[in-house]
């Protein structure tokens, strides 16, 4: 993905998350040189999910995500790039004493396939210089964006390393970089899915997969998907190859700073979430098979995550006027509260 001006024409922007540069919040986007239309894509069947009605707070969500491995082999945990809340949650998951008992693999967007040996050495506890470790994310396709320069990504690797230091060698967690580095000609999502298949599913293992939330959407406008070529979404690709084995979780809420000049047709009314929830604790995880959350509008609550700038009229959400609901997008969501 790359930064692009909102003045760009005839492109779509795939918003993966946010980052901060010199104190200015920016939206990470990707350029797609294909047409956009409102037709909807076929929805892969979502497997039934047994979840508590509400899992409140970081620790409560972490426990529920770990318990989800009793039902699924893959927990796909979407993030908003650079957000501290997402970092705190995934670190809480890997530090939980039950995580390493059930899960031995993690696949991340912020590591390249070509620096796997470096990442392995660091996660095992070997002495690796900062300059060497930085190559793990600096050799990804997204390095030019600066999105991985946030310290939260190195902190995640450090957290897994610390967990492994307390475990016997045969019980340690391995972290895989899923982004194709230099010399790896595969597309981003093809590479990620290949890593999950070869290193986890074909070995009858389980994995936590951490990528920008848009990679885990189970449904998108049809013509948007056609513009992406083979990269139709990691969760979709895994569901097609291994039905019922992936649990997709996406973030909703919190601030979203759009590119200059971009406005959304519908602003999210987070009071709908707040009225429907029993707990006042944020963040909170809820199932997207549960009413009323499953019926909330995708355009309203995640419409700012994927934009198109094709044609006249400026940039707009690819979900504009879409009938898609949140229940068609993922299996569960982590609600961070209102956007203020």
Please identify what each model-predicted range represents:
Residues 1-11:
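N-terminal secretory signal peptides that target proteins for export/translocation
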Residues 9-24:
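Sec-dependent N-terminal signal peptides
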Residues 17, 30-340:
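Compositional signal for N-terminal targeting/processing segments
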Residues 22-32:
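Hydrophobic alpha-helical membrane-insertion segments, chiefly the h-region
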């Amino acid at each position: 993905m790359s930064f692009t001006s909102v003045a760009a024409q005839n492109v779509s922007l795939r918003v993966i998350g946010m980052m901060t540069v010199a104190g200015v919040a920016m939206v990470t986007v990707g350029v797609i040189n294909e047409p956009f239309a409102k037709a909807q894509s076929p929805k892969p069947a979502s497997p039934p999910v047994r979840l508590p009605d509400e899992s409140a707070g970081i620790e409560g969500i972490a426990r529920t995500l770990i318990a989800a491995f009793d039902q699924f082999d893959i927990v796909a945990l979407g993030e908003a790039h650079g957000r501290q809340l997402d970092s705190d949650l995934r670190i809480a998951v890997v530090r939980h004493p039950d995580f390493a008992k059930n899960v031995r693999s993690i696949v991340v967007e912020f590591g390249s396939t070509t620096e796997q040996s470096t990442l392995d050495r660091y996660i095992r506890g070997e002495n690796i210089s900062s300059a060497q470790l930085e190559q793990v994310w600096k050799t990804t396709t997204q390095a030019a964006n600066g999105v991985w320069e946030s310290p939260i990504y190195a902190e995640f690797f450090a957290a897994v390393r610390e967990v492994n230091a307390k475990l016997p060698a045969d019980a340690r967690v391995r972290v895989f970089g899923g982004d194709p580095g230099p010399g790896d000609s595969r597309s981003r999502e093809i590479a990620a899915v290949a890593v999950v298949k070869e290193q986890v599913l074909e070995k009858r293992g389980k994995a936590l997969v951490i990528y920008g939330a848009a990679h885990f959407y189970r449904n998108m406008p049809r013509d948007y998907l056609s513009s992406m070529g083979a990269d139709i979404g990691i969760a979709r690709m895994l569901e097609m190859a291994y039905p019922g084995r992936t649990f997709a979780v996406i973030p909703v809420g919190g601030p979203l700073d759009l590119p200059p000049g971009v406005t959304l047709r519908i602003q999210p009314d987070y009071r709908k979430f707040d009225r429907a929830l029993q707990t006042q604790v944020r963040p909170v995880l809820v199932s997207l098979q549960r009413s009323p959350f499953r019926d909330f509008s995708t355009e309203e609550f995640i419409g700012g995550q994927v934009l198109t700038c094709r044609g006249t009229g400026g940039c707009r959400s690819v979900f504009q006027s879409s009938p898609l609901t949140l229940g068609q997008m993922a299996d569960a969501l982590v609600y961070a509260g209102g956007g203020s």
